[in-house]
Every structure is written in C-alpha cells, then in structure tokens.
A protein has these predicted regions:
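Conserved SAM-binding strand-loop segment of SAM-dependent methyltransferases
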Residues: 73-80
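N-terminal Rossmann-like dinucleotide-binding module
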Residues: 2-70
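Hydrophobic residues in well-ordered beta-strands that form the structural core
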Residues: 78, 117, 142-144, 173, ...
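Glycine- and charged-residue-rich phosphate/anionic-cofactor binding loop of Rossmann-like
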Residues: 50-53, 325-330, 347-365
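Contiguous beta-strand/loop segments that form the cofactor/metal-binding neighborhood of enzyme cores
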Residues: 2-21, 210-307, 340-354, 370-371, ...
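C-terminal capping/lid region of NAD(P)-dependent oxidoreductase domains
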Residues: 22, 140, 167-171, 191, ...
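Predominantly a Rossmann-like dinucleotide-binding segment in NAD(P)-dependent oxidoreductases
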Residues: 148-251, 379
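Beta-strand-loop-alpha-helix segment that lines the small-molecule cofactor/substrate pocket
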Residues: 2, 84-86, 91, 97-98, ...
Length: 389
C-alpha cells in the first residue's frame, strides 16, 4: 500500500464546525498565571463567549491579567469561592496550581458550573475520586485539559491502532523529556511540594501516557513498578538555576524531576514509561507500539506540545514480505490544538454532550502516576486499584 493511501485511509476529514453564536456563554477564569494566558487567548477568538470574571490569590494579579489581554468590564475576585458565589456562570477554567485543582473544581461543580480543568487532574488518586463523584452528582460537563488529543498526528496514532493494522497490542514504550527544562521561568509553583505536589510525572508525563493509553482504549492498570528521583532539581549547581540567577530554587525543590514505570495493563499489555524534566540525554527514546501484525514507531515526541519528531513508521508484512510504511507528519491542522480543546469543551456545554477528555479516562492516567510514586517510596511493585464511582 502506498504511503498516500495509508494517510488517506486514516486521515480524518477536517470539516469546519458551525458554531451557534445566538447565545453567549458566560465564563470565568480561576487562576491568572501563564496557562491562563492560553485560555483567554482562545476564548477571545470565540464570538459566543463572554469573559465576565476572574480570580487570583495574589492581590491585583487578576486585574493586571485582564488589562494585559485587553478585556474590559471584568469583575475580579480573590479566590474561587468568591467568584462562584457572586457570579452566574456557564463555565470556568481552572488554571490554578496542582494542589488546588480538586478544591476549585469540586466547588464549581457543586454550584452548577461546567469546568475545564487544566492538567494534571489533581495530585492524588483520592482527590481524583472525589472530583469524579462531584462531577457525577452535578451532571455538569468536566473536561481535562489535554490539548494534544486534538492534534491530527496524535489522532492518527489512535486510528492506526483501532484499524487493526497492528493486530493485538502487547507492548508499549513511551515517554519523553528535556535535557534541561525544569519549569522555573514561572516562579516556583511547579517545583514546590506545597503547590505542585508532583513534578515531571504530572506536568509532562501525563501527556505521554495519554497518547498511548487513549490509542489502546484506556485499559485499566493492574500493577506498577515505579521509580522517581530529584537529582537535578535539588542541585544548586544545576545550570538552569545558575544561568537564571536562582540557585536558591534547589532548596525549594520538593517534587520529582524524573520518573519511570513498568506497568501491567488489562488485556496483557505491558507499558514501559519514562519522563524527565532534566537528564544527561537528548531523548529517552521513541514511542513504540508493538502488535502481533505490526508495530508503530513514533519518533521522539514532545507530547505536551502535540508534536512528533518526524514521520511515523508502521513495520508489518505485505504479501509475505517485511516492509516499512511511512506515515507523513500532518502539518495542515487549521486552528491550534489549544483552541480545539477549549472549543470542544464549550460545544459540549452548549449541547449537553459528553466531555471531550473525560475523567473516566484521566483517572486511569492519574492512578498510574500515583502508583509510580507509591512504588518508588516502597521500593517494590504495587497494585493499582481504581474505586467505582
């Protein structure tokens, strides 16, 4: 089969969605840090969205945020409770630091507000369960902020697996990382345990996990043998700290900068995963999905950006011959993935549809991360159990 035939077979039609602009959705933004910049930039493109309020714990920060983005007549509050108690909203973006994700999301759902929650879903599996229970009770739309889901190349991965071209998938290798990339340009909220709770595992590792788990239908995890470390983050001589003039960050570092896990999934699938904020390596390797009929190699990815390092390849047999079929990178994708993430959430709010990135899947992602941390602390393999919601 020719390369173009493979591409045409799997490429999804990219049709423009007609948006009903007759009713405007009133939205608020909780937390006005750097990720909120991405949210408001997409909201401003949508004619059916009215940004009416925002909240931030730091005095004056919300006001400066909206001024920077040229959004006027916006009411600003000091915390999520004040905002939700005083506004009639259709939806909120939760863009706060990890430790407050559960609290803000649950409060919004309990007060009848739809939520798009930035990843990670939360810090612990217990918090994830509480969020899912609140969502179920509220009947509102709660979608988790995984914009790579909307990248056409990431969609292609799922389509290839679902097509049966690979046969039964039995082994997956995935991960990613940065040679030097502990996220400190935004201050210390990403690296302090009191605010972040988890480091590289939840910040960028969740994207790698989602890419492959979504492709194979999010099977439940059974056990994990995990390992985490913080060698770079706690080193005051770490070059990024020194170059940016903040060697004191090392004393504040309280999360992981590397994590790895060997996970057994339902259906006889093994998942070999590793992620790093910092390492003495250019990449921990390609993503590989191995099956009984074929295997898929995805060049080293930056899943958090929804990007892959080059054309994918399927290794399979054709007419008794071993062949490699190259899948070109899809570059023409229309609007950016972040816009698609926000738009799909709001469309679900308008229609009463299902969340585009549902908690029923992301709780599995969260359970694996939780299991890796537990296993590393105990120094042995642990079972993963996800309670019924």
């Amino acid at each position: 089969m020719a390369d173009n035939d493979i591409l045409n077979k799997f490429k999804e039609d990219q049709e423009e969605t007609t948006i009903d602009t007759s009713k405007k959705l009133k939205v608020g933004i909780i937390g006005t840090g750097w990720i909120a910049d991405a949210h408001i930039q997409q909201f401003k493109k949508m004619p059916d969205v009215e940004i009416v309020c925002g909240a931030d714990l730091i005095d004056g920060k919300a006001e400066k945020f909206f001024e920077k983005h040229g959004v006027e007549n916006v009411r600003c509050y000091h915390n999520h409770k004040e905002l939700i108690d005083n506004e009639e909203l259709d939806a909120v973006s939760v863009c706060t630091y990890n430790r407050t994700h559960a609290e803000c999301t649950i409060y919004a759902l309990e007060h009848g507000v739809n939520v798009i929650l930035e990843k990670p879903m939360c810090v612990t599996i217990e918090e994830a369960v509480d969020i899912c229970k609140a969502e179920k009770k509220s009947g509102k739309v709660l979608s988790i902020g995984f914009q790579p889901r909307f990248d056409e190349n990431m969609k292609m991965v799922k389509k290839i697996v679902e097509s049966g071209q690979l046969g039964k998938v039995y082994y997956i290798q995935t991960g990613g990382g940065r040679r030097r990339g502990i996220p400190t340009p935004f201050g210390t909220t990403f690296i302090e345990n009191e605010t972040a709770g988890i480091g590289a595992l939840a910040d960028i590792g969740c994207y790698s996990l989602d890419m492959v788990l979504n492709a194979v239908g999010y099977p439940k995890p059974l056990t994990v043998s995990g390992y985490v470390s913080d060698y770079f983050g706690k080193d005051p001589n770490y070059c990024d700290y020194v170059q940016k003039g903040h060697p004191e960050y090392a004393s504040l570092f309280g999360v992981d900068d590397f994590g790895a896990g060997f996970i057994r999934l339902e259906g006889g699938i093994i998942l070999d995963f590793r992620i790093a904020w910092a390492m003495n390596l250019d990449t921990p390797g390609d993503t590989i999905i191995m099956g009984t009929k074929g295997s898929l190699r995805i060049p080293s990815t930056e899943c958090w950006n929804g990007s892959i390092g080059g054309p994918m390849k399927i290794y399979h047999e054709v007419a008794g011959e071993q062949v490699e079929t190259e899948i070109p990178v899809i570059t023409d994708q229309g609007e950016n993935n972040f816009y698609k993430k926000m738009r799909s959430f709001l469309d679900a709010v308008k229609t009463g549809g299902k969340a585009p990135v549902p908690t029923s899947q992301i709780i599995i992602n969260q359970a694996i991360i939780d299991g890796i941390v537990r296993s590393s602390k105990l120094g042995k393999e642990v079972e993963i159990s996800i309670p019924e919601i």
